[in-house]
Curated annotation (Swiss-Prot):
Origin species: Clostridium botulinum (strain Eklund 17B / Type B)
Organism superkingdom: Bacteria
Membrane-crossing segments per the record: none
Classification via Pfam families: CsrA (PF02599)
One GO BP annotation of this record: regulation of bacterial-type flagellum assembly
Name of the protein: Translational regulator CsrA
InterPro entries tied to this protein: CsrA, CsrA_sf
GO molecular function, one term: mRNA 5'-UTR binding
Length: 71
């Protein structure tokens, strides 16, 4: 893991086209601004994990349910 220290209004770059800027530091939290191409999906990690888990659940298909569709 790379650890970088930034102050308010300082940025870091990921590749050539993603910029992350520290906008606000308050009460133990950090507000970040992210400039990235529109096609780039940006999710908080807890939301990303929830989506990943739901996708796994969706892949578990009950074959008995599919048999009813053949009729």
């Amino acid at each position: 893991m790379l650890i970088i220290t930034r102050k308010k209004d300082e940025s870091l770059m990921i590749g050539d086209n993603i910029e992350i800027t520290v906008l606000k530091l308050e009460d133990g939290s950090v507000k970040l601004g992210i400039n990235a191409p529109r096609k780039t999906t940006i999710l908080r990690k807890e939301l990303y994990e929830a989506v990943k888990e739901e996708n796994k659940k969706a892949m578990n298909i009950d074959m008995n349910l599919l048999k009813g569709l053949k009729k």
